[in-house]
Structure formats: structure tokens, C-alpha cells
Amino acid sequence: KKQMIFADSVRIGGDHVTSDLSSGLQIPSNTAERIKTIHGGVIATSMDDREMIDVDGQTGDWDHDRRKFTRSEIIGIIRPRIEEILEEVYHKLQAARFDTLPSQRIVLTGGASQIPGMEGLASRILGQQVRLGRPLRVHGLPQAATGPDYAAPVGLALYAAHPQDECWDFDLPEKRMGAMPMKRAMQW
């Protein structure tokens, strides 16, 4: 059955990637966000060394405002932060003993999950099947809210509106650290 069996979040995300680009390239945040969205990626190819990206600044200094960066430079700033995010996800999954649960498919949500190459890199770091989450078949949902950046809030709202009544057909792992076993907490 398709049902949510685990959910969590990390404290870092796409805004941190934008901030890294902004400080690394010394450009305004709105320009960094545009570059991340249009030219971002996590896997560099040989062509990325030749692809030049024009960056328009807003300082009034012509030489500083009209600069070019290679796509490889952009990826070189983005990838370390994405790796940090995915490693944090990996540690959360390990702490939750996710590998003992029957479904081991990970759904990435949020705007940064759309960065090209994210699914492949996530699969390598997390060692799991990964897919991009997006709200599908939601009647009345505005077009602007159908992307992965809205998948988590829309999905949680749907989950709350239509709770799953059926019982799980697997045992949850028990915590070994003296706390209430997870199984008992779920029965509560």
C-alpha cells in the first residue's frame, strides 16, 4: 500500500544554497536565487567549464555588475551544501532506523529538490530509491502550488484531511535507549 510511514525534516535547505551563492559570488540574494533556479546543478560535466553565465549586479559599478561565471563555478558552490543537506537526511534516517521499515523509498520535497542531478546524488548518498515529490491530482489546487516546493505542506494537509485508518502490517523497531518503545507510542 502507498502510505506514509515516516516523515522528518532537516534545518538546512534551498535558502542556504542561495545564501552560499550570494556570498560566494558576491551578488544580491535575488540574483543568487535566479542563478540557482535557472543554472543550478550538482553534477558538473566538461561542458560546464565552457558554459558562461552572465551575472548582473546592482551596485552601479559597471565592472563589478557585469561579471561572468562558469556553470562549474556555480555547481562548485551548490554541491557542497547539497551534500551537507543529504548527509543530514542520511543521519536522520539512520537514527530512525529507516532501513528496518518495509518501504525504503525516499520522497524529496522543497524547492531545492528540483536542482538538476539531485535525485542521482541523493540516491548515492542515501543508498535508497529516491523520487521527487509533487502534489498530484489535488482538486482546486492553484497551478503555482503544484511543484515540489509545495509537496510537503499539501501532502500533510491531505494526510490530515484523510487520515489512514488501516493498521500497519509490520512491526516498528523499538528504541533501545530506555525511552518508551516506538511501537507503544504508536498504539497510544
Language-model regions, residue ranges each:
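Helical "lid/coupling" subdomains associated with nucleotide-phosphate turnover
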Residues: K2-W188
